[in-house]
């Protein structure tokens, strides 16, 4: 279950997450943990993409939270344990920002990502970093993919109704009704 894994990461309990897997070691080797986190992110993205792309119902909300949480945690974990920065980053804060960033990008809903993550934390301490992360993620994805995951299939079929009345009417118009025989 993904929510248990998210809870483990947010409580900074990486060992509990790795227990029972091939990657569990008593001493908690950081390179093994980095590999473990990286593989989880990669496999989850591939599994969700294959399921949704194949017509199955793999969901979008929970996988977005899961991948975002793991990606943010992975980013902070790598920087903390490789000595690339002179200071220690908060794994929990980066996990939360990763959740907000991926959710804002996948669903094209930066405000929802900001407020939902703020509700999860129970405070407004991370409000500005969440705003920056969600805005950058949304602006970046908007350049590459103009439609959210929910409207993408309709747009590809040409059945997406927009807020522009003229475009919506032209979308609904059938050629058989326009051409005289």
Residue ranges of each PLM-predicted region?
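Helix-loop-beta junctions that constitute the ligand-sensing/allosteric loops
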Residues: 179-181
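Alpha-helical transmembrane segments and immediately membrane-proximal extracytoplasmic
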Residues: 1-176
């Amino acid at each position: 279950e993904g929510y248990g894994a998210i809870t483990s990461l947010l409580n900074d309990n990486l060992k509990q997450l790795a227990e029972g897997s091939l990657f569990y070691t008593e001493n908690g080797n950081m390179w093994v943990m980095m590999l473990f986190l990286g593989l989880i992110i990669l496999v989850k993205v591939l599994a969700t993409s294959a399921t949704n792309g194949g017509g199955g119902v793999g969901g979008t909300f929970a996988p977005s939270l899961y991948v975002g949480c793991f990606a943010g945690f992975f980013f902070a974990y790598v920087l903390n344990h490789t000595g690339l920065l002179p200071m220690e980053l908060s794994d929990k804060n980066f996990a939360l920002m990763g959740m907000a960033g991926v959710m804002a990008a996948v669903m094209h809903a930066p405000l929802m990502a900001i407020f939902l993550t703020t509700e999860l934390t129970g405070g407004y301490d991370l409000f500005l970093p969440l705003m920056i992360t969600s805005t950058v993620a949304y602006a970046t994805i908007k350049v590459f993919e103009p439609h959210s995951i929910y409207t993408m299939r309709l747009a590809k079929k040409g059945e997406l109704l927009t807020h522009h009345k003229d475009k919506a009417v032209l979308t609904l118009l059938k050629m058989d009704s326009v051409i005289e025989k």
